[in-house]
């Protein structure tokens, strides 16, 4: 029940916390959520919150300690509001509380000043109940009057306090979060054990066992450390001192960013961390109940916060609550000092405690939540030196006072503490007491985590900031520039992403905790995709509900107790979901950071895990075992591996440990998926809700996405469903968007996302591996597609509770999903980002943008994935990377793509369809691959899907199928039939329809003229298609089919029917050109699978949004058809010129594709001039497919991937050239020195000439001179009547002997 509450709270919390953070919400929030909020508030309030947490703790002592969340949520929330100071003071009566209260009071005052808290908000905030666990003492609930207010203030932007409270489980390792926040080391020593809120070390989880746990808590702290580390990164950014001892060390191997504060330590430290984690695991096993519950709580908190509803996500989890509690304290301290911006932002709401908790709540002193007031740092008191926590949670360690010190100490201290659980707390408290204090400073870490987690507030994530804010964060962020802070943190995170997983190992011991840690790390990753996190948290609430029994039992179950296996499983699942969401984000980042090899490794592992995860329980266990093994391997492996291991380890520990120690089978799969997700996330950080992203975030995300194919994976699926980790991947894109928006689909979305994330991770690594795995993967993908289709359809309807049914299919998907998902998710991610960034960004983004754009618009989750992501990024990717990426996409590209049922938008994104189509797609793709466009196929399909969806937004499947041209049917059907996906495709058909066939007919609607555009996109065409898409991004988010020969035909058919055009698969490239256009038969069904896989996933809304977007774009294109034509023709000319031989040599059909590149625009340009294709390849396909084919083929087919890179480069150059030429021509055109036709000709020729100049530079002066010469020449010809119908014709040949032909077909020819 608590989990449900939490779930509910989370959803609400994420929504409200983000926006308002009103206390009213608190009640709704599950206790967990409340606690998180309270914690956050406490954090926000600085450590003050911590104290309140303690107070709460007493109330929740037994229950709360174990199920802190439940009590914490509501009671705290309300209590806090009402009791605030009084409660704090009352509770303060407790021995240790008195000291804390003293500190607390100052924090109260402090909070307002620090957080600028909104009085109303803070008051409303539920009060954080912090269990003060002094050493062995029972937790003493500390009233945190200030907590709420501060949290509120902290959450100002968002209702952080509730989350904080909720997150801040009473126990919650107090927080390691606390550590981060309360990090204020000073208090830590005294309060370390008792450390206020829950002397998190001792009993964060188990309330009764606090005394014994104290030592154990230190062990958990290790996990906490790790967990905390994610926050540390931020803190580190804020306070360098901690950097040295970064908890992130485990992650450091990859060279996690020192800014990641936790991760900057040297690899050695990382290793130490890992060792510690292992030790912790052992310790945790000893204190499983306690430690693990604490860990879990912290993890849950981390996950929840990170996901924006940390508390909610894992509300059920103990972690959330404990985390929350610690967090709360953290915020409390942070608020004054740390709450700083994050807290002020309110984004910190969830992360503050998370940091401490996860990082090393217990170990660090657990009490990072020390409620050290600004001046109260001393408060540390005593606070119980009880050794349980280095810094009392309750203590408000003034981050400002010794935040840095504390931070540094904290990090090492946490470790030190780790060794001596009980004593450690004290020692830590003393030497490391600071660590918790640093926790406060580590607010940055919080922030990073928070930022990540802050899915909704996406960038608000800065709980960390709040924590470190006091000194570092404060000065740095001033608590104001959350966005900047988040970006910074994100960057740090990226750097330390690989390290971010480090905490996982320790948490591994406590399956729950690892989860949380993972969550936190994920959060970090999420930080980049805070939105995703936020979505995820919103989504996750439901899964956590099961954790309602959050008792020590639950904790224990997390701790691997079979008894509470089920609930733990549920909890874990939700956590996994959120985690996987965050993880995916984080993973992407990490992966990116780590580099290809690591990525591959991770992916492979993930993939393996995924496969094993497919079988939910049984495999889960094995998966866990495997993960554990991996963990060990990674640990042994060393820095590089460590990160990966950590990331995996986190999942493994989360899931593996859980499995090992009696984890719920389901959770382990979740964990595995989570791991995958994490990697995926690492890959890219595209928040689930782009709408929530700020420009900064978008920029960061876009940058990330553009930078590597890691982005490919879609962080978008906010949270993969924990339960069906296997399936998670597929729907994540669409589902994630949709689900997040719907909330009801959260589990499905989560699953999809998780699956997608893992899949994506896998896919990337599979890029190379995939070829080998293609056969198996294809089968799997096909199944997955099917599943996806089913699940997608189910999920699509927001109302449907498809998530449940979705999960079953998902497991199958999981196994093969990696490949399909990966391409899809990659695209998706980029798409989302781009869409928010710029729907019309013509680069590779263009295709992706629409889908994401729509999604981001919230139109629905348009999981439109365009291979274009890869393509668009290709220019930025290294050739090697790009080729594999494209290959990977090709193999998996078909998998996920489908916009799959554009018509059935509501229907699943057709991710399933993608799967169904996967096999054919793969087969075909393989064929295409052989043609050097293997990757293209999938992409084409995706693009096509989008185009279809746009043009046919809801077209009938029949029409779409019909769309498929006979040729495509012929060419494609053969391939397609093999895929069983055909059956699923039907549903997907609408989207799938075009997706598959080279997607040439991206948007049939646009196209009759644009058919060309889609015509021949093959491997190389793929890029050309990219260009098309860049130019006509929405025009056809046509996926370039790897062997997009059919692209041409598709393009032809596309005009007739968007789906049909897309349908023409690249297989029938040559025949497709004409046939596709001519016959858009219902052949689509067989190809359908192709389409789906390659196509873009579109949810109902997504489809609509996409359609609207495409149409808008089309209108714009039509409006500026002349421009588009010029550009396209110029591009085509250049491209044709560039790769005419290839194009012709490659495939006659593709030759038409020559125009394909510009096709997008070309199509627009050539509505009537389809003949445009006549160019030198096959006779102009009905729609100028010939030209498109020509160009595409030449560009893509022949030259293949390597060519693609070149092509993209040229394309970009071309685009710049076009801009320059246009600028130069404009004056003449305005003066009417030249006619429109001449203008176009000159533009085309000049661009061609410039692009083919030896220097390759675009010199405005030279461009101007060239244009002037052309203008004069045209004028001259006109005067001398030399300008026949096509003035450019004569001059053009002279000017550009070679290009004329191409140029002609490009632009003039169509008219001619």
Swiss-Prot record:
Residues 206-223, 430-439, 975-988, 1300-1312 have a biased composition (Pro residues). The keyword Nucleus applies. The modification Phosphoserine is found at residues 239, 448, 453, 498, 500, 526, 548, 612, 614, 719, 725, 734, 738, 872, 874, 929, 936, 963, 965, 992. Keywords: Isopeptide bond, mRNA processing, mRNA splicing, Nucleus, Phosphoprotein, Repeat, RNA-binding, Ubl conjugation. Induction: Up-regulated by estrogens, androgens and glucocorticoids. GO terms for cellular component: nucleus. The modification Phosphotyrosine is found at residue 732. Residues 267-289, 1022-1040 have a biased composition (Acidic residues). Residues 158-169, 254-264, 991-1000 have a biased composition (Polar residues). It is found in: Nucleus. Residues 929-938 have a biased composition (Gly residues). One of its GO terms (biological process) is mRNA processing. Residues 7-27, 226-235, 649-660, 739-749, 763-792, 866-884, 1189-1209 have a biased composition (Basic and acidic residues). Residues 1-85, 157-349, 408-1086, 1137-1209, 1277-1312 are annotated as: Disordered. Residues 191-205, 411-429, 813-828, 1041-1068, 1152-1170 have a biased composition (Low complexity). Interacts with POLR2A. Belongs to the splicing factor SR family. This is Splicing factor, arginine/serine-rich 19. It comes from Homo sapiens (Human).
């Amino acid at each position: 029940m608590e989990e449900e509450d939490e779930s509910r709270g989370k959803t609400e919390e994420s929504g409200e916390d983000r926006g308002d953070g009103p206390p009213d919400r608190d009640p709704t929030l599950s206790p967990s959520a409340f606690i998180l909020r309270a914690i956050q508030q406490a954090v926000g309030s600085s450590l003050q919150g911590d104290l309140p947490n303690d107070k709460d703790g007493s109330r929740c002592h037994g229950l709360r300690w174990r199920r802190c969340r439940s009590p914490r949520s509501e009671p705290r929330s309300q209590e806090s509001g009402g009791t605030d100071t009084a409660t704090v003071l009352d509770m303060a009566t407790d021995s240790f509380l008195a000291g804390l209260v003293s500190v607390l009071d100052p924090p109260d005052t402090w909070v307002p000043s620090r957080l600028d808290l909104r009085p109303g908000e803070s008051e409303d905030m539920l009060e954080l109940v912090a269990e003060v666990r002094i050493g062995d003492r029972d937790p003493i609930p500390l009233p945190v009057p200030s907590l709420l207010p501060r949290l509120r203030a902290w959450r100002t932007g968002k209702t952080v306090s509730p989350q904080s409270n909720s997150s801040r489980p009473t126990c919650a390792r107090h927080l390691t979060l606390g550590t981060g926040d309360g990090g204020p080391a000073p208090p830590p020593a005294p309060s370390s054990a008792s450390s206020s809120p829950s002397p998190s070390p001792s009993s964060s989880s188990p309330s009764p066992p606090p005394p014994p746990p104290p030592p154990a808590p230190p062990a958990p702290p290790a996990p906490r450390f790790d967990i905390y580390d994610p926050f540390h990164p931020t803190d580190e950014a804020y306070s360098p001192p901690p950097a040295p001892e970064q908890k992130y060390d485990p992650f450091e191997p990859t060279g996690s960013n020192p800014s990641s504060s936790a991760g900057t330590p040297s690899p050695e430290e990382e290793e130490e961390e890992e060792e510690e984690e292992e030790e912790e695991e052992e310790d945790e096993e000893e204190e499983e109940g306690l430690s693990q519950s604490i860990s879990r709580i912290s993890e849950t908190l981390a996950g929840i916060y990170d996901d924006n509803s940390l508390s909610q996500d894992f509300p059920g989890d103990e972690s959330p609550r404990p985390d929350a509690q610690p967090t709360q304290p953290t915020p409390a301290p942070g608020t004054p000092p740390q709450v700083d911006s994050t807290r002020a932002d309110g984004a910190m709401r969830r992360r503050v405690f998370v940091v401490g908790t996860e990082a090393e709540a217990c170990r660090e002193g657990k009490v990072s939540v020390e409620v050290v007031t600004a001046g109260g740092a001393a408060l540390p008191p005593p606070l119980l030196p009880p050794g349980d926590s280095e810094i009392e949670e309750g203590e408000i360690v003034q981050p400002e006072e010794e935040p840095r010190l504390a931070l540094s100490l904290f990090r090492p201290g946490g470790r030190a503490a780790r060794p001596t659980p009980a004593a450690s707390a004290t020692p830590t408290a003393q030497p490391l007491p600071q660590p918790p204090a640093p926790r406060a400073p580590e607010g940055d870490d919080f922030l990073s985590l928070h930022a990540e987690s802050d899915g909704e507030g996406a960038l608000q994530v800065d709980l960390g900031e709040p924590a470190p804010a006091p000194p570092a964060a404060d000065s740095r962020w001033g608590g104001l520039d959350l966005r900047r802070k988040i970006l910074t943190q994100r960057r740090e995170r990226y750097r330390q992403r690989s390290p971010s997983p480090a905490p996982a190992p320790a948490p591994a011991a406590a399956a729950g905790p690892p989860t949380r840690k993972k969550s936190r790390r994920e959060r970090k990753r999420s930080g980049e995709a805070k939105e995703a996190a936020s979505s995820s948290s919103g989504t996750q609430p439901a899964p956590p509900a099961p954790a309602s029994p959050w008792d020590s039992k639950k904790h224990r179950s997390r701790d691997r107790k079979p008894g509470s296996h089920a609930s733990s499983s549920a909890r874990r699942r939700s956590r996994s979901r959120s985690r996987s969401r965050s993880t995916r984000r984080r993973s992407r980042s990490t992966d990116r950071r780590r580099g290809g090899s690591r990525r591959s490794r991770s992916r492979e592992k993930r993939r393996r895990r995924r496969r094993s995860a497919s079988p939910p329980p049984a495999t889960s266990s094995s998966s866990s075992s495997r993960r554990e093994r991996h963990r060990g391997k990674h640990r042994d492996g060393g820095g590089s591996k460590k990160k990966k291991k950590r990331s995996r380890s986190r999942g493994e520990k989360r899931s593996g440990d859980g499995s090992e120690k009696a984890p719920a089978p389901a959770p382990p799969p979740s964990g595995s998926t989570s791991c995958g997700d994490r990697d995926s996330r690492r890959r890219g950080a595209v928040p689930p809700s782009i709408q929530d992203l700020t420009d900064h975030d978008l920029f960061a995300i876009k940058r990330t996405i553009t930078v590597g194919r890691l982005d490919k994976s879609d962080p978008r699926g906010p949270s993969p469903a924990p339960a069906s980790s296997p399936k998670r991947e597929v729907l994540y894109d669409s589902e994630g968007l949709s689900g997040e928006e719907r909330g009801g689909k959260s589990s499905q979305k989560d699953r999809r996302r998780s699956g997608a994330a893992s899949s994506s991770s896998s896919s990337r690594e599979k890029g190379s591996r995939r070829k080998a795995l293609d056969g198996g993967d294809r089968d799997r993908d096909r199944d997955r597609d099917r599943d996806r289709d089913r699940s997608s359809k189910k999920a699509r309807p927001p109302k449907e509770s498809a998530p449940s049914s979705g999960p079953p299919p998902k497991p199958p998907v999981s196994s093969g999903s990696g490949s399909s998902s990966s391409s899809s998710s990659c695209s998706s991610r980029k798409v989302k980002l781009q869409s928010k960034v710029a729907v019309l960004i013509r680069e590779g983004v263009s295709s992706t943008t629409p889908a994401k754009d729509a999604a981001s618009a919230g139109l629905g989750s348009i999981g439109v994935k365009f291979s274009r992501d890869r393509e668009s990024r290709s220019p930025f990717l290294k050739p090697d990377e790009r080729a594999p990426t494209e290959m990977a996409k090709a193999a998996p590209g078909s998998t996920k793509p489908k916009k799959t049922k554009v018509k059935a938008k509501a229907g699943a994104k057709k991710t399933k369809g993608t799967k169904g189509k996967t096999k054919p797609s793969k087969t075909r793709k393989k064929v295409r691959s052989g043609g050097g466009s293997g990757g293209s196929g999938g992409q084409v399909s995706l693009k096509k899907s989008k185009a279809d969806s746009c043009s046919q937004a809801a077209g009938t499947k029949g029409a779409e199928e019909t769309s498929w041209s006979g040729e495509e049917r012929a060419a494609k059907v053969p391939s397609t039939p093999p895929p069983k996906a055909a059956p699923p495709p039907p549903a997907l058909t609408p989207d799938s329809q075009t997706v598959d066939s080279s997607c040439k007919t991206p948007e049939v609607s646009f196209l009759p003229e644009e058919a060309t555009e889609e015509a021949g996109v093959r491997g190389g065409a793929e890029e050309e298609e990219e260009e098309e898409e860049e130019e006509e991004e929405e025009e056809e988010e046509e996926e370039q089919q790897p062997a997009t020969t059919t692209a041409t035909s598709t393009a032809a058919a596309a005009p007739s029917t968007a789906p049909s055009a897309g349908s023409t698969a690249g297989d029938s490239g040559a025949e497709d050109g004409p046939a596709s256009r001519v016959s858009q038969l219902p052949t689509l069904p067989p190809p359908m699978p192709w389409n789906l896989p390659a196509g873009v996933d579109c949810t109902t809304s997504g489809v609509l949004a996409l359609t609207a977007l495409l149409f808008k774009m089309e209108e714009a294109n039509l409006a500026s058809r002349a421009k588009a034509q010029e550009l396209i023709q110029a591009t085509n000319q250049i491209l044709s010129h560039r790769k005419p031989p290839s194009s012709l040599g490659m495939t006659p059909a593709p030759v038409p594709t020559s125009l394909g590149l510009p096709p997008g625009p070309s199509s627009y340009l050539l509505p009537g001039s389809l003949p445009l294709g006549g160019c030198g390849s096959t006779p102009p396909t009905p729609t100028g497919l010939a030209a498109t084919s020509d160009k595409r083929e030449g560009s893509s087919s022949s030259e293949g991937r390597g060519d693609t890179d070149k092509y993209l480069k040229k394309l970009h150059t071309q685009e710049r050239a076009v801009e320059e030429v246009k600028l130069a021509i404009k004056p003449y055109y305005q003066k009417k020195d030249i006619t429109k036709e001449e203008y176009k000709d000159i533009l085309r020729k000049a661009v061609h000439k410039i692009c083919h100049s030896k220097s390759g530079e675009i010199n405005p002066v030279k461009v101007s001179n060239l244009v002037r010469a052309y203008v004069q020449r045209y004028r001259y010809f006109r005067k001398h009547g030399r300008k026949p119908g096509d003035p450019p014709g004569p001059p053009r040949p002279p000017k550009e002997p070679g290009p004329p032909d191409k140029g002609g077909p490009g632009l003039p020819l169509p008219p001619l």
